[in-house]
Swiss-Prot record:
Subunit structure: Component of the SKI complex which consists of SKIC2, SKIC3 and SKIC8. Interacts with PAF1.
Organism: Homo sapiens
Protein name: Superkiller complex protein 3
Taxonomic superkingdom: Eukaryota
Disease: Trichohepatoenteric syndrome 1: A syndrome characterized by intrauterine growth retardation, severe diarrhea in infancy requiring total parenteral nutrition, facial dysmorphism, immunodeficiency, and hair abnormalities, mostly trichorrhexis nodosa. Hepatic involvement contributes to the poor prognosis of affected patients.
Transmembrane segments: none
A GO BP entry: rescue of stalled ribosome
């Protein structure tokens, strides 16, 4: 291609680019490049086209190629710059600065405007890459260029300002050249500003100063800039603040700097730098309080001023506030660490560390000393600075490391012998070791070298103070140096504290001492010792206002858990002032500070006690005693509070603890006596008179001990008198009190006092109390004591002259009490009571006294009641009623007024009498109320005609009257033991409660009281009652003797005598007595009863016909009794004459009207049905009765019993019936538990498999409730046997195999102990023997079983059942050997069974023997025989067991593959009959197994087996067997889906046998 063609192609390329045909352009360029590879324009055009086609890499390569070819040509560089600007190319950041630089070079001489534009772009690029120096230099060059071009000042100002903006943002990273260019830029920008002053100019100036302040070495320039701005803007704070802060931080705060600070504070009173500057000036002037105040306020505004924090710490150290100083130093150090490590900051850091260490050492505690050592270790070159070494030694001394401290001290002494601090250090170490003489010398040497150090004077004064009494009192010693220290350092609080000690303890000048303590506390408000001393002295000087002011100031400032001393003292102040709530709050605050201060706890207890908080006070004193076990006071207060709260036993225990420590502590002895006295009073209220006597004896013992130590204390004599008088109500026979001879005027020993002697001693004690202190209440107590003595004389019938004298004395004493205190209603009341006593009878005086008592105390139920009694005594019933009513309205719970109303009701014959007496017993126990209520209960019970009335139902039954009356009457006779009717009523009530022995005892007590009485009839009645009760308790001989002691003329006596003879077994004599009774009987009913009793007596003698004749005589009377008809019915049952029994029962049903007879009627009816063999009717009859009377537990119990005996198939219902009986009535429930257990056993395996083992648990419970019942022990034996059988089925070890013999012994022992019917005993013993032998056989204890049978046969050889048992035992080993039995043996066994031919189990056992010998037909015949017997007897369980055994026998034959249609049909027949009897899981299983044997793979086989496996209600063992066969069936059918279902079912039920089979079958 020619050059012309090249030009044409380039032109075409240029045109294509203009027309945006970039691909065409590329083609033309490539055409050119084929001819001329180094054509500049072609490469440039390629770059342009490629850039437009968004092919930056190709464009870059083209431009670079062009630039290489022609480096001084602009086009390629411009294109490259545009390309980099357009695309963020990978090499753009690296290459673009070079491109811009090349363009600058090319534009410099060609186009200044474009040069400037490129220059700005280059600066922006450098700025982005944080190349500050390049930015500064390039922009500087731009400004210079513009200056050369003659640019305006405004433009130049903006350019300089722009440069400040570029560089001001990151001054920390700049080098010196950049910084200088920045400052030059600021200066030029400020100089070129056209508006001065202006807002814009001010901001620029601020930025300039801000930048300068970041560079410490530019301090001169900073100062100049600040001063320049101050001159232009005199009202602006900023330059002043920066300048002040700069001067403060640099440590060059000159007078001029002070002026700046003052000027700044004038402008803004809260200016941080200004206040800090003023604070530093105050510190220099030793105005420490001003310094701390200004520095603290300044640092709030300027918290990052290191020097400010340092100087604040310095001022705080000077003012002896080391804790605050440590915090200030720590703050300064934190700021220094944030600023980084420069030369100045390192210096500041060392200063702060030094000061912090000094402050920490002043704190003196171990942790602070440890921290001080760590702080000193941080100071550079600390080991070479003596001052720091001194501090380290002091730190070691404070923490107890004396060896380290001494070592440093010795090194310092050798290196710096002229340094005062070193000698002072040596002195302190000697002082610590209590070597005060050496310490004195060293401090003196230190003071010789520096006399103006307050600390040295203080320490020397302290040395003298502790050196001894002499130096302490010597004014030239301790006092002089303390005063010098106080003069040199007026902020040293501790020196003022010791000056206070000096003036208080040595001089005795309390006012001056208080001034010193106040000064010390003002200087250091954490000095608890000074504060406490100031407060204590103020209290001593009776300046409570000042004391309270100090305490309030401290407590207001105190944080939680501090200032204990102040809280404690203020709490005690409030406690003394009676402000209890404030005292509690303050003492609680004191305890927060020190929870282990027992004094605080005691004070808090006192505060709680003062405001009536006994429980909280008790806790406080308890805590105090725990913290200080030696404190008697705390324990005493605990005891005293427990005594107040009525916890007398606990109080006694606490008092005893005190007495053990200090035997003569009278308050504790008094407390012990009071507690026993109060317990005696409580016992008397509960009518526990014996306890009360014991408590009084103890109380007198303690009061006597107290009087031995303090016989001059009146209250102790009064308390002893109270104790003696307290037992006035107790029966004289019970009062035998042992009193220490000291109280009776003897030197030693004890004396037993009777009631009259004790009361007399009480009067003497009151007399001694009056001699010591004559008080109205003691006169009153003495008067009451004389009254009680008079009462006792009247009760015992003693000398009437003495009685009169005592009553006169009583009146005299009570009048004296009234004269001393005429407003006390109790004294008037007591005087009234004595005045109306029968020995005086001054009713007018009594009425006057009661009225005066009411006038003295309006709410006075006692006086109104006494007034009512007075009116009632004088037969003024209406007035008495009104008085009692008034008393009731005033105090409805006051017992006596209710008794009064009851007596009025009784007098007028009101129906409310019984209710009122009952209400008195509900309120509290009182002899009059108790006797009245018991009388009305007995009276109501004796009236047999009222049983169906609502009044009887409510008063007796609903109100539970009999036990309530019995309880209160027991209390009555406990106290009043000479009133025979009370014992008679008590015996009567005990009879009703079936407490026969207690009733007999009560009747016997009545007899003893009536022996000397003239009323012989009453005595005979008591004997009759006693004899009747002896007979019912089984003491027949005593009963016979009792009745013989009566004339035996009254019908009741003769009948009682006859009954006693009958119960003793003297039937002939009993018959004679009944015949004698017949001769004198009058009423038809009584005659019927006697004839019935006579008939029973004749029956007992074997005269059945005579008995029947007598009972027939009863039945033909006009009014035959139900008892005689019941006896006739029972006689028919005994004779097995159903016709007679039925006729008697029909007659009986005509006369029975009461619901109470339901049980007897039902029992007799069901017994007749049982005699007739109608088992179903037996259950139906009782079920019908239960439905009619669902609340009768006896019927439920009977139902449970007959179900177990006659209807075992309904055993589940029998269990329910037994449980209901047990719930309704625990008495019937005892026997019902046995029936329940028997029914549970009858339910079979479904019950036995229960995890709770229901039957066994039930029978165990029954054994606990009735251990004397032999049937229960027999039942327990059966339950254990069932449990062992279940264990064998489940392949587990039986648990109770050793119990059979023990339980058999328990049955025999129970039969001997209790009297049961003979045939019942024999049956139970035989059954128990059979069960025990069976259990022994099953558990393999053959020899024991054989021994048991042999032993039983020796005592009675004629026992076919036992012989059968023996044969079963003997055959067991033979059968287990699986050898054929000889014919002779089989014949012997057959004979034995034939001798027990009516026994179903015997035939079943013989069948089992035949089966073991392969004699299947013979076995079948035996089973059929057992089935026949069971059917004849109606034994459901016998029939079921026989059918199942028969079916099992036939199935075994079938399984043996014996081809005979007889056996399969026998299985089907027997199981079908069993299923007719009841749902029988075993029968269903046997049918399924028969089907399995017949057709293993048939669908019917699976259906039958699945029914057993999956349907509920099948026992585990049966379901497991079915599961085993079903698994075999399914594997035979290869039905793996159903196999998986069955395996999951086996896993759910824990059937390991089935799972093992599955593993075996699946592996084959």
């Amino acid at each position: 291609m020619s050059s012309k063609e090249v030009k044409t192609a380039l032109k075409s390329a240029r045109d294509a680019i203009r027309n945006k045909e970039y691909k065409e352009a590329l083609k033309h360029c490539k055409t050119v490049l084929k001819q001329e590879k180094n054509n500049y324009n072609a490469w440039v055009f390629i770059g342009v086209a490629a850039a437009e086609l968004e092919q930056p890499d190709q464009a870059q390569s083209a431009y670079k190629k062009a630039a290489e070819l022609e480096p001084d040509q602009l086009l390629a560089w411009q294109g490259l710059a545009n390309l980099y600007e357009k695309y963020n190319h990978i090499n753009a950041k690296d290459d673009l600065p070079g491109v811009y630089q090349k363009l600058l070079d090319l534009y410099e001489s060609v186009d200044k405007q474009k040069w400037c534009d490129v220059c700005k772009k280059l600066v922006d690029l450098y700025y982005q890459e944080k190349k500050h120096l390049e930015v500064a230099r390039t922009w500087h060059k731009l400004i210079k260029t513009r200056q050369e071009q003659g640019a305006e000042n405004e433009e130049l100002h903006q350019l300089w300002r722009k440069l400040t903006q570029f560089l001001a943002e990151s001054t920390e990273d700049q080098n010196n050249e950049t910084q200088q260019l920045l400052f030059t830029a600021f200066e030029n920008a400020l100089g070129l500003s056209d508006k001065i002053p202006s807002e814009d100019h001010q901001v620029l100036y601020r930025h300039f100063i801000q930048s300068l302040s970041k560079f410490p070495h530019e301090s001169a320039r900073l100062k100049k800039a600040c001063e320049g701005m101050i001159n232009i803007y005199p009202t602006v704070q900023y330059p002043l603040e920066v300048l002040c802060l700069h001067l403060i931080e640099s440590g060059n705060l000159t007078d001029e700097g002070q002026q700046y600070c003052c000027r700044l504070v004038e402008m803004d009173s809260k200016s941080g730098p200004g206040l800090i500057g003023l604070g530093i000036k105050a510190l220099q002037d030793k105005k420490y309080e001003d310094a701390v105040r200004n520095l603290t306020e300044g640092l709030k505004e300027s918290p990052v001023c290191t020097s400010g924090w340092y100087h604040l710490a310095e001022a705080q150290v000077k003012m002896h506030r080391p804790k605050e100083a440590v915090l200030s130093c720590s703050q300064a150090l934190k700021i220094v660490d944030n600023l980084g490590a420069s030369g100045n900051s390192l210096y500041q850091r060392n200063l702060c560390l030094h000061l912090k260490a000094e402050a920490l050492i002043k704190l003196s505690d171990y942790d602070s000393s440890e921290e001080a050592i760590r702080t000193l270790d941080q100071i550079s070159d600390a080991d070479n600075i003596p001052g720091l070494l001194v501090l380290k030694s002091l730190a070691y001394r404070n923490k107890g490391s004396f060896d380290e401290a001494a070592k440093i001290m010795e090194d310092l002494l050798s290196s710096y012998p002229d340094l005062a601090e070193v000698h002072a250090l040596e002195a302190l170490i000697h002082f610590t070791k209590k070597d005060y003489l050496q310490a004195e010398k060293c401090f003196q040497r230190a003071l010789e070298k520096d006399t103006e150090v307050a600390e040295y004077h203080y320490q020397l004064g302290l040395t003298y103070w502790f050196m001894g009494e002499e130096t302490r009192k010597d004014k030239t010693k301790a006092l002089t140096h303390f005063l010098k220290a106080a003069r040199l350092d007026t902020y040293m609080g501790k020196v003022f504290c010791y000056l206070g000690h000096y003036y208080r303890d040595v001089v005795g000048d309390k006012n001056r001492a208080r001034g010193c303590y106040r000064k010390a506390f003002e200087l250091d408000d954490t000095d608890a010792e000074s504060g406490a001393a100031a407060v204590d002295l103020s209290v001593e000087l009776e300046d409570m206002e000042m004391a309270l002011a100090i305490l309030t100031t401290v407590t207001q400032k105190a944080s939680a858990g501090t200032a204990k001393w102040a809280w404690l003292r203020r709490g005690l102040y409030y406690l003394k002032a009676g402000q209890h709530s404030q005292a509690v709050a303050d003492l609680q605050a004191a305890l927060r500070a020190d929870p282990k201060d027992f004094n605080c706890w005691e004070s808090l207890g006192e505060a709680y006690l003062s405001r009536g908080g006994y429980t909280t006070a008790l806790k406080s004193f308890t805590k105090a005693s725990e913290l200080n076990p030696e404190s008697i006071y705390s324990v005493f207060k605990v005891a005293a509070i427990q005594q107040i709260l009525g916890k007398y036993k606990e109080a006694v225990a606490q008092y005893q603890m005190i007495i053990k420590k200090k035997e003569d502590y009278v308050p504790a002895l008094k407390g012990l006596g009071e507690c026993h006295l109060m317990m005696a009073k409580a016992a008397l209220v509960d009518y526990l008179d014996g306890k009360a006597v014991d408590y009084i004896e103890k109380a007198l013992e303690y009061f006597t001990c107290a009087l031995q130590h303090r016989a001059d204390v009146s209250c102790l004599w009064k308390l002893a008198g109270d104790a003696c008088t307290c037992l006035y109500a107790v029966a004289p026979s019970k009062v035998n009190v042992h009193v220490l001879g000291v109280l009776l005027g003897q030197k030693e020993g004890k004396q037993v006092l009777k009631k009259n002697e004790l009361l007399h001693l009480g009067g003497r004690c009151y007399g001694r109390a009056l001699k010591l202190m004559s008080t109205s209440n003691t006169w009153c107590d003495l008067g009451i004591n004389y009254y009680r003595q008079a009462q006792h004389l009247a009760e015992t019938g003693s000398n009437m002259n003495d009685l009169k004298e005592l009553l006169e004395k009583s009146l005299h004493c009570l009048k004296k009490a009234v004269r001393l205190d005429s407003n006390n209603h109790l004294y008037w009341n007591a005087l009234g009571v004595v005045a109306c006593y029968s020995g005086i009878g001054n009713y007018a005086l009594a009425q006057h006294c009661f009225i005066k008592s009411i006038q003295s105390e309006q709410i006075n139920a006692v006086a109104w009641t006494n007034l009512g009694v007075l009116y009632l005594t004088n037969e003024n019933i209406e007035q008495a009623h009104e008085a009692f009513k008034m008393a009731q309205s005033l105090d409805p719970s006051y017992l006596m007024c209710w008794i009064g109303q009851a007596l009025i009701a009784e007098a007028v014959g009101s129906y409310d009498t019984m209710d009122l007496f009952r209400h008195t017993t509900e309120l509290n126990m009182h002899t009059e109320g108790a006797l009245g209520y018991a009388y009305w209960v007995c009276t109501t019970l004796q009236d047999k005609s009222n049983r169906e009335t609502e009044l009887y139902q409510y008063n007796i039954l609903q109100m539970n009257a009999i036990p309530a009356a019995q309880v209160i009457l027991n209390k009555y006779v406990e106290r009043i033991q000479n009133y025979a009717p009370a014992f008679t009523m008590l015996g009567y009530l005990n009879e009703h409660l079936q407490l026969k022995k207690e009733a007999a005892n009560a009747y016997q007590r009545a007899i003893l009281l009536l022996q000397t009485a003239e009323d012989q009839d009453t005595y005979n009645v008591a004997i009759r009652n006693y004899g009747r009760l002896l007979c019912s308790t089984g003491e027949y001989d005593k009963a016979i003797q009792a009745f013989k002691s009566t004339p035996l003329e009254v019908l009741e006596d003769i009948i009682g005598f006859a009954l006693a003879l009958f119960m003793k077994g003297l039937y002939k004599e009993s018959s004679k007595a009944y015949e004698r009774a017949l001769s004198i009987v009058e009423s038809e009913q009584d005659k019927a009863h006697i004839l019935t009793a006579l008939a029973i007596t004749e029956y007992k003698q074997g005269k059945t016909d005579v008995a029947k004749t007598l009972l027939f005589k009863c039945s033909i009377l006009k009014e035959p009794t139900t008892e005689s008809l019941q006896a006739l019915c029972a006689l028919g049952l005994a004779m097995q004459d159903a016709t007679l029994s039925k006729a008697a029962l029909n007659e009986l049903l005509k006369h029975i009207k009461h619901k109470d007879s339901n049980y007897q009627r039902c029992l007799l009816t069901s017994a007749i049905y049982a005699l007739q063999g109608r088992s179903v009717a037996v259950q139906k009859q009782i079920s019908k009765a239960v439905h009619s009377n669902p609340g009768d537990p006896a019927l439920w119990s009977l139902l449970s019993r007959v179900v177990a005996q006659y209807a075992q198939r309904n055993a589940k219902g029998g269990v329910v019936a037994g449980n209901v009986a047990h719930i309704l009535d625990s008495n019937h429930g005892k026997k019902a538990l046995l029936y329940t257990a028997v029914n549970q056993l009858a339910m079979g395996s479904s019950s036995a498999e229960d995890e709770k083992n229901t039957a066994l648990k039930t029978i165990q419970k029954a054994a606990l409730l009735s251990p004397g019942d032999p049937a229960i022990w027999a039942g327990l034996m059966a339950a254990c046997h069932a449990d062992d059988k279940l264990a064998l089925v489940n392949n587990t070890q039986p648990k109770r195999i050793d119990l059979y013999l023990a339980l058999l012994s328990a049955v025999s022992a129970s039969i001997k102990d209790e009297k049961f019917f003979e045939n019942y005993n024999q049956s139970l013993e035989k059954w128990s023997l059979s069960q025990a032998v069976t259990g022994l056989i099953d558990t393999g204890r053959i020899s024991e079983a054989e021994t048991l049978c042999t032993k039983n046969l020796k005592s009675n050889p004629d026992q076919p059942a036992v012989i059968l048992l023996l044969r079963q035992v003997q055959c067991k080993p033979l059968l287990e050997s699986q050898k054929p039995l000889p014919d002779a043996v089989l014949e012997e066994l057959q004979k034995t069974v034939m001798s027990n031919s009516t026994s179903v189990p015997a035939w079943q056992w013989l069948a089992h023997v035949y089966q073991s010998q392969g004699m299947m037909r013979a076995a079948e015949m035996c089973y059929r025989k057992s089935l026949q017997l069971a059917s004849q007897r109606g034994s459901w369980s016998g029939k079921l067991s026989s059918l199942l055994r028969l079916a099992l026998l036939a199935l075994k034959v079938c399984m043996a593959n014996i081809s005979n249609d007889h056996w399969p049909s026998l299985v089907q027949e027997a199981t079908t009959e069993a299923l007719k009897l009841c749902f029988c899981p075993l029968a269903v299983l046997l049918q399924a197994l028969l089907q399995f044997k017949r057709k293993m793979g048939a669908r019917e086989t699976r259906r039958l087996l699945e029914r057993v496996v999956y349907q509920p209600g099948y026992p585990k063992s049966i379901a497991s067997t079915a599961r085993w066969y079903l698994l075999r069936h399914l594997y035979a059918k290869d039905d793996y889906e159903l196999i998986d279902v069955l395996v999951n079912n086996a896993k759910t039920h824990g059937d390991t046998r089935a799972l093992e089979l599955n593993q075996r079958l699946s592996s084959q």
